[in-house]
Amino acid sequence: MSQPIKTIIKGTGRYVPPRVVTNTDLTRWMDTSDEWIRQRTGIEQRHWIPEEGGVGASDLGLEAAKIALGRAGWRPTDIDLIIFGTLSPDIFFPGPGCLLQQKLGLSETPALDIRQQCTAFLYGLAMADAFIRSGLYRRILFVGGEVHSTCLDISTRGRDIAVLFGDAAGAVCLEAVATDAPVGVLASALHAQGEFADILMMEAPTFREKPGISEEMIREGRHFPKMEGRSVFKHAVRRLPEVAREVLDKANLTVADIDMVIPHQANMRINQAFMKALGLPQEKLFSNINRYGNTTAASIPMACDDALEQKKIGPGSTVLFIGLGAGLTWGAVMYRFPG
């Protein structure tokens, strides 16, 4: 009997633009303070593209992809499919997956864009696992890339959101391996609840109104992201423990089997509350939000790469990837590193 196909992480990479914006820097543009931001979010700094712009999500994604490909030992031509997650595409269309494909020097490799915002890696990893186990593709490159800084309201009016976000990209090379060992993607659980779409959204530009962007929209700030922070917090502390238990059940594991939790890096208080609800020690929570802020689709793959680099996880580690974001969407993936 042939061995089952598993999806393993072959290589990871992350990239941030060189420009660092500290909490103190933000006080030049808005009424805030380093202490206020740290206490509410855990963020100390974030990376933004140059003030003059000219850098897109696919550009950041290219740099992260190069690192991941190198660590995987792949050439770009080894990629069977590109999955690109973002809420901040370079242009309205086509999506950054196709732009990245061209920048990698590829000609006809399929490219798929997903718009799951903060849960893009979870949805992308579950999709890639299904593709790989079906035999359709053997090697898949997932990239999450974001340029938030160009569309933030960097003023006192927008401070509740503007202080949160950073520009970045994370990449993961996923490969099919035939093995009886309980490794790779062990289980996934995905959910959405569209009735809460309006608590975390960016309304304009839009195709449902004419014109798609107007002076009135700009005056009202509808071209900036908006968030009902308390509502997002409430949903997160409820849904994250639920989906964690669901994916553990699917994988026939218990909370005690988790070596490390790598969550979406949205807010330190959310993640600490989630760990407490599961009865997990904070030492099993990986966090780098203090250095990068919320990087949305890049967040979890960046944190995975960072955790591997710091040797917080490695061969044999059982990891819970988990997050909640706009949509609302939320999900979790149980993963065990080979070895």
Model-predicted regions and their roles:
Residues 1-53, 156-234, 238, 242, ...:
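Condensing-enzyme catalytic core mediating Claisen C-C bond formation in acyl metabolism
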Residues 10, 85, 115, 140-146, ...:
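Short beta-strand segments
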Residues 30-39, 91-105, 142-151, 211-217, ...:
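Acidic-glycine-rich active-site phosphate/pyrophosphate-binding loop
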Residues 43-47, 78-83, 102-115, 151-157, ...:
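Glycine/charged-rich beta-loop-alpha catalytic/anionic-binding loops adjacent to active sites
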Residues 58, 62-65, 69, 88-89, ...:
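Claisen-condensing/thiolase-fold acyl-transfer catalytic domains that form or cleave C-C bonds
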Residues 71-107:
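Anion-binding (especially nucleotide phosphate/pyrophosphate-binding) glycine-rich loop
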Residues 77-85, 255-264:
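Short glycine-rich phosphate-binding loop at a beta-alpha junction
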Residues 133-168:
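Flexible, glycine-rich active-site loops centered on histidine and acidic residues
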